[in-house]
Amino acid sequence: MLQKKIEEEAAKYKYAMLKKCCYDGAYRNDDETCEERAARIKIGPKCVKAFKDCCYIANQVRAEQSHKNIQLGR
């Protein structure tokens, strides 16, 4: 589900460089926030926006998936 959401978001960007920024933002990094990671981007504001958008979407999907009810067969 996460991959599908990120693919949909990346498809909104016309240029390959911006798509890469989006995919980079989707990578999991529990040590830093999206803002902290985006602060290191030097390419330009469009890349930063794509990075943050995908980072926030990925974090949201991960949070939703981690709270699913799991039934154990006992």
Swiss-Prot record:
Q: Where is this region: Involved in C5AR1 binding?
A: 15-44
Describe the location of the Anaphylatoxin-like domain by residue ranges.
Answer: 21-55
Q: List the disulfide bonds.
A: C21-C47, C22-C54, C34-C55
Domain of life here?
Eukaryota
The taxonomic lineage of its organism, from the top, reads: Eukaryota, Metazoa, Chordata, Craniata, Vertebrata
Function text: Mediator of local inflammatory process released following cleavage by C5 convertase. Acts by binding to its receptor (C5AR1 or C5AR2), activating G protein-coupled receptor signaling and inducing a variety of responses including intracellular calcium release, contraction of smooth muscle, increased vascular permeability, and histamine release from mast cells and basophilic leukocytes. C5a is also a potent chemokine which stimulates the locomotion of polymorphonuclear leukocytes and directs their migration toward sites of inflammation.
Query: Positions of the region Required for 90% of C5a activity?
Result: 72-74
Q: Which CDD domains does the UniProt record give?
A: ANATO
Q: Which InterPro entries match?
A: Anaphylatoxin/fibulin, Anaphylatoxin_comp_syst, Anaphylatoxn_comp_syst_dom
- GO BP annotations, alphabetical order: complement activation, alternative pathway; complement activation, classical pathway; inflammatory response
Q: Which UniProt keywords apply?
A: Complement alternate pathway, Complement pathway, Disulfide bond, Immunity, Inflammatory response, Innate immunity, Secreted
Task: Supply the PROSITE patterns for this chain.
Answer: ANAPHYLATOXIN_1, ANAPHYLATOXIN_2
Record's protein name: Complement C5a anaphylatoxin
User: Where in or outside the cell is it found?
Assistant: Secreted
Residues in coiled coil: none
Residues of the signal peptide? none
- Recorded name of the encoding gene: C5
Q: What GO cellular-component annotations does this UniProt entry give? A: extracellular region
